Curated annotation (Swiss-Prot):
One of its GO terms (cellular component) is plasma membrane. It comes from Haemophilus influenzae (strain ATCC 51907 / DSM 11121 / KW20 / Rd). PROSITE patterns: ABC_TRANSPORTER_1, ABC_TRANSPORTER_2, METN. The lineage of its organism: Bacteria, Pseudomonadati, Pseudomonadota, Gammaproteobacteria, Pasteurellales. This is Methionine import ATP-binding protein MetN. NCBIfam families: ABC_MetN. The gene is metN.
């Protein structure tokens, strides 16, 4: 449905050239939800704006539903864009128009009949849960309600693709959850292909089928959500996955934690990161028995993404130095990421 081939985007600045996108290729199948994740300034917004040619690529091709947009005339592009809806971090609603009138605007611009507009917009407001707000003005809506209006407006022309540019980043956590649930429902019921960009791995984890990681204008990793969470190949992907966890040491341990052991009875506090099959295997128990070490679990968390389990365990590991080293090597050989957080006295 969406195919980006070797996209490059270079901005000409007064004193230099800025490469925002560098040879980016991405293929999104019909009906998928794909998330592009990256830090601020990584090129996410430029990438999504290249899909509907709000930003024209310096080189490369953009193909949507079999049509190469980069070869279209201006008039042909206007028509092709009707198949591509878009929502933004900021809702861009017209304050002088009601909810109904804001959603109806694309159909009015297409000179649709009043009867069709009435029927279509009524159905869309029902879909996004705003039937009772049809006559309200944007100033009387919450942030989540405004984004629902923007989503309904983006769907008014029956697009095949919906682009979401940081659509939840200005919303509180509860509202974010409701908007993500709505996007998932729209994808399921209407079969719309969704491309979203975000800096939050939690968003990707919750609704995406596919994920691409962007860094300094390059796609550094991509695959299904399950593949990336089970076996992240780049440090950046690993960092984003870790950000979905909220685990910390008890205060008494934090207060006594040192970077190096102060004496022979100072034992390491180790974080073990499990993904895929290593989550279900009793590896810590096996290591304890095999090497004669004692593991006192301080905190642990397991989660799911794309049908794959992943998680962390932090433990105090007691034993002689050789046994602890052998334990770490054994776990790493079994695809467990091992990180020594410090030592307790």
């Amino acid at each position: 449905m969406i195919k980006l081939n070797n996209i490059x985007k270079i901005f000409e600045l007064p004193x230099k050239k800025l490469t925002a996108l560098d040879n980016v290729s991405l293929n999104i199948e019909k009906g998928q939800i794909c998330g592009v994740i990256g830090a601020s300034g990584a090129g996410k917004s430029t990438l999504i704006r290249c899909v509907n040619l709000l930003e024209k690529p310096t080189s490369g091709s953009v193909i949507v539903d079999g049509v190469e947009l980069t070869k279209l005339s201006d008039r042909e592009l206007v028509l092709a864009r009707r198949q591509i809806g878009m929502i933004f971090q900021h809702f861009n609603l017209l304050s002088s128009r009601t909810v109904f009138e804001n959603v109806a605007l694309p159909l009015e611009l297409e000179s649709e009949s009043k009867a069709k507009i009435q029927e279509k917009i009524t159905a869309l407001l029902d879909l996004v849960g705003l039937s009772e707000k049809r006559d309200a003005y944007p100033s009387n809506l919450s942030g989540g309600q405004k984004q629902r209006v923007a989503i309904a407006r983006a769907l008014a022309s029956d697009p095949k693709v919906l682009l979401c540019d940081e659509a939840t980043s200005a919303l509180d956590p509860a509202t974010t959850q409701s908007i993500l649930k709505l996007l998932k429902e729209i994808n399921r019921t209407l079969g719309i292909t969704i491309l979203l960009i975000t800096h939050e791995m939690e968003v990707v984890k919750q609704i995406c089928d596919q994920v691409a990681v962007i860094d300094q204008g390059r796609l550094v990793e991509q695959g299904t959500v399950g593949e990336i969470f089970a076996n992240p190949k780049t440090e950046l992907a690993q960092e984003f996955i870790r950000s979905t966890f909220h685990i910390s040491l008890p205060d008494e341990y934090l207060e006594n934690l040192t970077d190096t052991p102060k004496h022979s009875k100072a034992y390491p506090i180790i974080k073990f990161e499990f993904t895929g099959r290593s989550v279900d295997a009793p590896l810590l128990s096996q290591a304890s028995k095999k090497f004669g070490v004692e593991l006192s679990i301080l905190t642990s968390q397991i989660d799911y993404a794309g049908g794959v389990k992943f998680g962390y365990t932090i433990a105090e590991v007691e034993g002689d130095e050789d046994a602890i080293t052998q334990t770490k090597v054994y776990l790493m050989e079994n695809n467990v990421r091992v990180e020594v957080l410090g030592y307790v006295q």
